[in-house]
Regions:
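Post-signal peptide N-terminal regions of Sec-secreted extracellular proteins
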Residues: 29-134
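N-terminal prepro-regions of secreted/extracellular proteins
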Residues: 1-50
Length: 134
């Protein structure tokens, strides 16, 4: 094998290695985030559901990244089951006068959603920057 053939093989092997290395995904610190808003949400309003893989140990939370137009909002985390009634995992209140977050801790692998259970100061609430992390 000539020198140019050896160099060609080394270059080809190096390029193939770089393609493989570039295709490897680095795991994220947060498994999932829902960035959304609430417009005139009333008591009983349900967020969309999400699947928590429980692969990262992150505490499930709701956050107001903007102030809202009521005094406070109470959110309840719901653990969804297909074969029995859903489980209520607790209610957390968030003030509307400032940004903030409330946490339910790490949850097991399954489907979840959040429900508005109370609104203080108004009949409905709007939050321009509402987030769920899981």
């Amino acid at each position: 094998m000539t020198l140019s053939e050896r160099v060609g093989r080394v270059v080809t092997a190096t390029a193939a290695g770089l393609v493989v290395a570039a295709s490897v995904t680095v795991p994220a610190f947060a498994e999932g985030t829902i960035n959304s808003h609430i417009s005139n949400g009333r008591v009983g309003f349900e967020t969309r559901s999400w699947w928590d893989d429980d692969s990262d140990g992150v505490s499930t939370s709701v956050s107001h990244y903007s102030k809202c137009n009521a005094r406070s909002v109470s959110y309840e985390l719901i653990h969804e089951y297909s074969w029995r009634p859903d489980a209520k995992l607790g209610t957390q209140a968030l003030s509307c006068s400032r940004t903030g977050s409330r946490y339910w801790g790490r949850q097991v692998e399954d489907d979840y959603h959040v429900v508005i259970r109370g609104i203080s100061g108004r009949a409905s609430v709007s939050v321009n920057d509402f987030r769920i992390k899981y």
